[in-house]
Amino acid sequence: MRLALIGATGMVGEVMQKVLVERQFPVTEFIPVASAKSVGNTLNWNGASHLIRSLDEALAMRPDLVLMSAGGTISLEWAPKFAAAGSFVVDNSSAWRMEPGIPLIVPEINAAVLSAETKIIANPNCSTIQLVMVLKPLHDLHPIEAVRVSTYQSVTGTGKAAVDQLENERRGIFDGPMAYAHPIDLNCIPHCDAFLDNGYTKEEMKLHHETKKILGDSRVQVSATAVRVPVQGGHSESVLITFQGARPSLPAVRQILAAMPGVVVQDDPANLSYPMPRNAEGRDEVFVGRIREDLVCDRSIHLWIVSDNLRKGAATNAVQIAEHLVSAGFLQTPLTPSH
C-alpha cells in the first residue's frame, strides 16, 4: 500500500519509521512528508532513499494510509482532505480525540469499533495510553470509581527542542534556546502544556477526558497532575485507583494485569525490581509495579506505570492501529513490500 508519513522528521516520525520496519508493515510506496525547509531533500528508510514531499504533493499521490504526527493545526486542515481522497488517517495530535464520531483507539482495548467507513482515527495522548492499558482489564472485572494520577513525563514528549535544552544544561550551557519556561536539568516542572481556567493544564485534562472515552465509561472519575522531569526514556505514573466495590486482592490484580496483552508486571521490590523509564526505553510494553493496598481507603490500590512515550505512547500504537486496519480487511495488503 501507499503510506504517507506526515511529520517524518520529527521525534515521533523518526520512531514511526523504525517501528514500521521492525513490525514489517506492508508498504509498497513510502511517502515522507515534512516542513517546507525539508521538502525536496531525501530521507533514507528501509534501505532506500525517498524524496520528502509537501502536503499537496502527498495528497495528489492518494496514499492508502496516512500516519500524521505534525501537530493539531496541520491535522485539522489536512486530515479531512486525505480522508475525502479515500485515505485512512491515523492522527497523533489532540485535534480529533474528543470529537464525537472520531474513534480514540488503543488497539488492545477498543480496536473493534473501527470500520471501513472510519477514515480519521485518533491516537490518544501518550500518558493516557499507558494508563488505560492498566485500567481497562481491572475495570472490566472490578468496576473503577475514580483514578488519581501524577505523571513524571519525559522531555521527549515535548520534542527535540526540549531534549536539546536538557542536554545543553547538562553540559553547563544555559543561554541556549529554551523549550521550557525554566531549566529542566536537576528540576521538576509541574507544567505540561498550557494552563486552563480551572487550574489544570491541557495535559491533565487530556487524561481526564480521554480515559473516559477509551474505557467507554463516563462514570469513571479522573484527576491528574502532570510533571515534566529531566528524563528521556519514557513517562512514569503514580496511580491511585478506587473501585466501586471491594478492591481485588493484590494477587488477583497481578494476575489480571499479567494476562493483558502488552502489559508486563514487574513487581518484586524485595529484589529491587520495579518499572523505570531507563529500562522501558525502546520497548513497546507498558510496565506496572509497586502494586499495593492504599492505607486510607479500603477500596483503593496504588500502582506505578512506566512506558516509552515515543513508542507505545505514540508511534507503536499508531502502527498497531494500521495493522488492525489491514487484519480487518479495511486496508489491502500488497504482495511485495517496499525497500
What feature does the model see in each segment?
Residues I120-Q130, G199-H208, G313-N317:
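A glycine-rich, Thr/Ser-enriched phosphate-binding loop motif common to dinucleotide/cofactor-binding enzymes
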